[in-house]
Amino acid sequence: MWSDLLLILDATLRMAVPLVLAAMGGVFAERSGVIDFGLEGKMLGGAFVAATVAHLTQSAWMGLLGAIIIGITFSMMHAFASVTKQGNQVVSCVAINIFAMGLTTVLGQAWFQRGGKTPQLPPEARFTTIELPFAEELRVVPVLGDIYYELISGHNILAVSYTHLTLPTT
């Protein structure tokens, strides 16, 4: 029972990272007066490009760079349509979402023949997790050991720590 709850909390911390980062991006966009419903499309495009580039180069860092580039590209498309051409921001965002959904599905099927899914990366090509000191030793301590081992230690420092440290700035 207790370990199941910790596993759920652990998964919640990991899975919340992209949603929290997108929400923070939406908050910053709204504060600047830009309506950006295209965050889902940017996330989808970034995830697909990151997985594809990481698969081709066997480097998670190159995949991250690819995701950053596609996110900037989609944002520039939105800015061009909304600011330069004075189009409706909501329509531009919906177009980005539809474009990203269609493009990732078609390219994923054409390139990988896996129903739109990208291949798994080998463990050495992924971001490594950070094991905090004494995590294994403290695992035997009731309740606190499990919390330290399962919930705090063993996460990817790039994702979880960055997200939870920058959240108060919004």
Task: State the predicted function of each range.
Residues R14, P18-A22, K42, G46, ...:
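Alpha-helical transmembrane segments in multi-pass membrane proteins
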Residues E30-G46, V83-I96:
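Short, non-helical or kinked segments that cap or interrupt transmembrane helices
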